[in-house]
């Protein structure tokens, strides 16, 4: 019987999901994106060649694997077409293998204009968005005024909806945000020019996924960002605009929750965050261990190029993530970045409002007030890069992994020891 796996980030994103999704596509016939947009990147290293993707599922790099963009994704048509062209240039054929949900909300220039203008207006209180229009596009979806992929294929309907939306959003841009408005005719013409390329890929993704599964296909649901950026469960308001947790694999693609059989939580061996928001175990990245993590871990955003904030591993944060996702097993990534550190620290809980708590709180205010409680463990001098078995890891590295398993209560089923596909230790295969 076919089996479906959901891959989610358990921290604030950038956990190394792209490589693991690519590795797992060896055992899947379809890969599905179910939330987010072109605001989150995933980097694959295959045979030493690096490929960065933002919208198209990582499975596209595996010949014969079908890829799906579900209704939970907000779609920038120019960006998905640019990604297709970039892949075509390295010999990867996309259009015949990619299906885009007709219910995807479309990101248009006024969404980007609103996103950028709002961040400028917030000043020091900015959220740290990528400025790509993701949030405003989700707002339109919830307000029931989104232009969806199916609308774009109907020129008359699209033109009417676009005019109505621009009347509304241009009023806000001009009168509240005091910035330039967006031109109707140019927006209309540019969008319609992309329709001939887009149209063959648009369809009923929900039915396609059901048909594939019933025909025996294993499906892999690829989450973007991280669970603590979830709009409901993250450090609100310092969150993204979508649900990043595993449950959204169902609503964001059109399959029932009973079709989600295994939840793989991708967990970095230390903690990082991009942009604003609380981060209890954060370290300064201009010195000491923080600098080591940032430098050795190459901690710069795939999409924005922004330097990531770095800190010690936070087991209390991971407990929250395991809880909200129903994680079956974890994949531990970037263990090799810790090589050479004499002492490691694990955050096991916090002092918060005069009490000791052992799980990350809900919302930014309490999270910002947390004082981390640390447990120290000895590090290791030996290299872990490229290790293929658990026994090949240094004893102290194995002890570090064991301790995290005990603190969180979920097994570590996979360990990534480098960026390439082959640099992976499998203790329990998610698809088996």
From Swiss-Prot:
Its cofactor is Mg(2+). Homodimer. Plays an important role in the de novo pathway of purine nucleotide biosynthesis. Catalyzes the first committed step in the biosynthesis of AMP from IMP. IMP binds at residues 14-17, 39-42, 130, 144, 225, 240, 306. Its EC number is 6.3.4.4. This is Adenylosuccinate synthetase. GO terms for biological process: 'de novo' AMP biosynthetic process; IMP metabolic process. It comes from the Bacteria. Mg(2+) binds at residues 14, 41. Keywords: Cytoplasm, GTP-binding, Ligase, Magnesium, Metal-binding, Nucleotide-binding, Purine biosynthesis. It is found in: Cytoplasm. It is an enzyme of class 6 (ligase). Binds 1 Mg(2+) ion per subunit. Belongs to the adenylosuccinate synthetase family. Transmembrane segments: none annotated. HAMAP family: Adenylosucc_synth. The gene is purA. Pathway: Purine metabolism; AMP biosynthesis via de novo pathway; AMP from IMP: step 1/2. GO terms for cellular component: cytoplasm. It catalyses: IMP + L-aspartate + GTP = N(6)-(1,2-dicarboxyethyl)-AMP + GDP + phosphate + 2 H(+).
